């Protein structure tokens, strides 16, 4: 059974940065739903490429079956990992329902790491991070933030109600954020 930590927060909250540090220091494999989707979009002969491209450009959510299949394949490919950080997923109730349908009984969801950060700070980070993403422009970012507020934040509230959320303020310097994240993982691994 795979240990899974969901890493959620608004676009630009530092999910990728913190996941890289957790991977390097704690041995969890970082699976970014967005990176997997972008890679699939670019893969020659992908049956989902055009569909994924349309959703990414519009800032909308890709069908859950596609995302779950990509995540499951990535976990199978790294089956000897300590655990998995799933960054940017689930993004809504449909994602969570689809995840449970496809992955129920195959994984141990340890907790949800919620990186909270003011939206204006997140947008500024995205515009200046220089990753060359097609969706790092003001128009797409506004749509992504709107999608986050309408769809993802309610799923975070759901996880909060069932006691799974561990919130860390990610507006601070990365070293401070990471120190708090390490404490969250240490507490979770003592249980």
Swiss-Prot record:
Binding site for a ribonucleoside 5'-phosphate: 38, 60-62, 88-91, 133, 144
GO cellular component: cytoplasm; nucleus
Keyword Iron: no
SUPFAM superfamilies xref list: P-loop containing nucleoside triphosphate hydrolases
Annotated region described as LID, given as residue ranges: 128-136
Record note on cofactor: Binds 1 Mg(2+) ion per monomer.
Organism domain of life: Eukaryota
UniProt keyword Kinase present: yes
GO molecular function, one term: CMP kinase activity
Pfam family, any one: ADK
The reaction(s) this protein catalyses: CMP + ATP = CDP + ADP; dCMP + ATP = dCDP + ADP; UMP + ATP = UDP + ADP
Residue ranges of the region described as NMP: 32-62
Expression across tissues: Expressed in the hypodermis, intestine, and pharynx.
Alphabetical keyword list: ATP-binding, Cytoplasm, Kinase, Nucleotide-binding, Nucleus, Pyrimidine biosynthesis, Transferase
GO process terms (BP): 'de novo' pyrimidine nucleobase biosynthetic process; CDP biosynthetic process; UDP biosynthetic process
Location of the protein in the cell: Cytoplasm; Nucleus
Residues given in the record as ATP binding sites: 12-17, 129, 172
Annotated InterPro entries: Adenylat/UMP-CMP_kin (IPR000850), Adenylat_kinase_CS (IPR033690), P-loop_NTPase (IPR027417), UMP_CMP_kinase (IPR006266)
Disruption phenotype: Confers resistance to 5-fluorouracil.
Subunit structure: Monomer.
The family this protein is said to belong to: Belongs to the adenylate kinase family. UMP-CMP kinase subfamily.
Main function: Catalyzes the phosphorylation of pyrimidine nucleoside monophosphates at the expense of ATP. Plays an important role in de novo pyrimidine nucleotide biosynthesis. Has preference for UMP and CMP as phosphate acceptors.
Protein name (record): UMP-CMP kinase 1
Organism of derivation: Caenorhabditis elegans
Top-level taxonomy: Eukaryota, Metazoa, Ecdysozoa, Nematoda, Chromadorea
């Amino acid at each position: 059974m795979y240990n899974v930590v969901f890493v959620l927060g608004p676009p630009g909250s530092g999910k990728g940065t913190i996941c890289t540090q957790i991977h390097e220091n704690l041995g969890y494999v970082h699976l970014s739903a967005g990176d997997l989707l972008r890679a699939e979009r670019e893969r020659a002969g992908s049956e989902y490429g055009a569909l994924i491209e349309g959703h990414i450009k519009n800032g909308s959510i890709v069908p859950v079956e596609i995302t779950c299949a990509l995540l499951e394949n990535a976990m199978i490919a790294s089956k000897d990992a300590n655990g998995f950080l799933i960054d940017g997923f689930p993004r809504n109730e449909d994602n969570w329902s689809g995840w449970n349908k496809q992955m129920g009984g195959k994984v141990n969801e340890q907790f949800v790491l919620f990186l909270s950060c003011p939206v204006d700070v997140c947008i500024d980070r995205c515009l200046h991070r220089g990753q060359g993403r097609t969706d790092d422009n003001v128009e797409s970012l506004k749509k992504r933030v709107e999608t986050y507020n309408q769809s993802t934040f309610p799923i975070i509230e759901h996880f909060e109600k069932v006691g799974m959320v561990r919130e860390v303020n990610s507006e601070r310097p990365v070293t401070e954020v990471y120190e708090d994240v390490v404490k969250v993982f240490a507490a979770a691994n003592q249980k």
